[in-house]
Structures are given as C-alpha cells and as structure tokens.
Amino acid sequence: ENVIFPGYIRGEIIEGAYSGADLFFFPSYEETEGIVVLEALACKTQILLRDIPAFDPWMQDRVNCYKGKTNQDFIDYINKIINHELPSTIEEGYKVAKERDLLLIGKQLKEVYEKVESL
C-alpha cells in the first residue's frame, strides 16, 4: 500500500512524480546508461541503486546516491532513507545531472565531431 506502480508517465507529470517521491529505487541488474536515474537526479530525488558496473564511476555510494547489492541491503537502505536516518545525497546527485545535461553533452559531442572532421 506504500508503493505505487504508475506505469508509463509523460511530460510534466514525470517531473512531479520524481519530485514528490521520497526515494527513487532502481534495482536493475543490467543497465546501459540509466536515463531514468538522470531524470530522478535532475528532479532532486534521493536515489538507491543496485551496485552494478554501469553506474561506475559517475554514481558514488554515499556521495551522490546509495547503492545496495542484496535484498537485505535494499531493505535496510529504504528504511533508513524514508526515516531520514542517512545523510541526503540529493544535492551531489543534482550536480551529476547538471554535468550530464543533454545540451552540454551535445556541445561536447559536436566539438569531438568537428575535431575528427578537421583531421
């Protein structure tokens, strides 16, 4: 009764969903980039991830997120996060989202293409 599975969410509603959440829990075993993680970070939501290589080194446990490996880790972290027993990593997480902003990454990619093109 304390968990909501809303399905696919579009547009401005997604920002409200992330922002209104106590926690963004992403226990995926496999991931390529983690766009949903970046969305949650950009909305200043506390993050709990599975500790998998896809999030290294940009997501750092106890710095800009929390990471767990086992179900018991997740249970412990969820309880501590929702009861405010752990320091917030939200502001550091938000910095990660800003560093990976699409406009910034697009500009960097353009510069790389232009450099390669000039060779």
Give residue ranges: language-model regions.
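Conserved acidic donor-binding segment of nucleotide-sugar-dependent glycosyltransferases
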Residues: M59-Q72, N79-E85
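Nucleotide-activated donor-binding/catalytic signature segment of Leloir-type glycosyltransferases, i.e.
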Residues: E1-I9
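A charged, aromatic-enriched C-terminal amphipathic alpha-helix characteristic of glycosyltransferases
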Residues: P87-K115
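Short alpha-helical donor nucleotide-sugar binding micro-motif in glycosyltransferases
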Residues: Y8-I9, G16-A21
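Short alpha-helical segment that forms part of, or immediately flanks, the ligand-binding pocket
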Residues: E15, E33, L38-A42, P53-P57
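Aromatic "clamp/platform" in nucleotide-sugar-dependent glycosyltransferases that forms part
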Residues: Y29
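Short hydrophobic beta-strand element within catalytic cores of glycosyltransferases
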Residues: Q46-L49
